[in-house]
A protein has these predicted regions:
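Nucleotide/phosphate-binding catalytic cleft detector across ATP-hydrolyzing
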Residues: 1-13, 17, 24-115, 132-250
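Catalytic metal- and UDP-sugar-binding loop of GT-A-like glycosyltransferases, i.e.
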Residues: 118
Length: 250
């Protein structure tokens, strides 16, 4: 079997994904990733390659352990890693590796098509990939949970409001809780919508590709939109897997 292992260390958790060619066969999430938790994967699968990526500080000890545990080559994703897309960002050394990976996956899924890539995680990133497979740039703002939390932490009286798919989000809240919820949710939807409209004008973008922990929630709040929205929960992992295979062949 042709298995590859993708390790994506995010801001608040780590995601481990096993691929058979381009198909996801197993996904695991960890709060804090340790080598011991990866042992069952190495025992279960005969891997042909591993890729490790972190948006935070590189875990050198983990990388060393990975190389000790498997004979498969381990690719550590950096800003110097060869990519199947062109990055025209002015400061590529500061560009989040997760944003790069999501863009790579979007190009693979929608070749020669300009798309808006939205990753709704701890932070909300909204990036443009043009029809020539170029990462053009994008925006970074607080994610949903961070917005709710900041209103609670940086004010004297506003409560911490929870959110779920079933919650109503009126245009204008009728009490403090709904005012906060509607302000945050409608605000973030308006932010995405405005970015899409601008990307459509500038790059003929016709599709939003949505991923991240809050992507399912946001899709439910944008269901009445006329925009074409595709949700891919494993977008970053798919991009990292594509980068791994690209480097195997180059």
């Amino acid at each position: 079997m042709d298995y590859t292992l993708v390790i994506d260390q995010g801001n608040t958790s780590s995601k481990v994904t096993v691929f058979e060619n381009d198909k996801v066969v197993e996904t695991l999430r960890f709060g804090v990733l340790s080598v011991e938790e990866l042992c069952p994967i190495f025992e279960k699968y005969e891997l042909r390659g591993v890729i490790y990526s972190s948006v935070a500080k590189l875990d050198v000890r983990l990388v060393e352990s990975l190389r000790y545990m498997t004979e498969a080559p381990v690719l550590v994703m950096t800003h110097e890693t060869s990519l199947p897309i062109k990055v025209v960002y002015k400061t590529p050394h500061t560009l989040g590796l997760d944003r790069v990976a999501a863009a790579v996956a979007a190009v693979s899924l929608y070749p020669q098509e300009a798309v808006l890539v939205v990753d709704a995680g701890t932070a909300l990133t909204i990036d443009v990939v043009d029809g020539e497979s170029q990462f053009v740039g994008g925006n970074i703002s607080p994610g949903l949970a961070m917005r709710f939390k900041s209103l609670n932490e940086f004010t004297g009286a506003l409560p911490l409001v929870e959110y779920s798919v079933s919650d109503a989000t009126p245009i204008f809240g009728y009490d403090t809780t709904t005012a906060i919820r509607s302000g945050v949710i409608n605000g973030i939807v308006a932010e995405i919508t405005s970015s899409f409209e601008k990307a459509s004008e500038a790059y003929n973008c016709k599709r939003i590709v949505l991923t991240g922990g809050d992507s399912e929630y946001l899709v439910s709040k944008m269901s009445d939109s006329k925009m074409m929205i595709d949700r891919h929960q494993d977008l970053v992992a798919k991009g990292l897997n594509r980068i791994l295979r690209y480097n195997e062949n180059n």
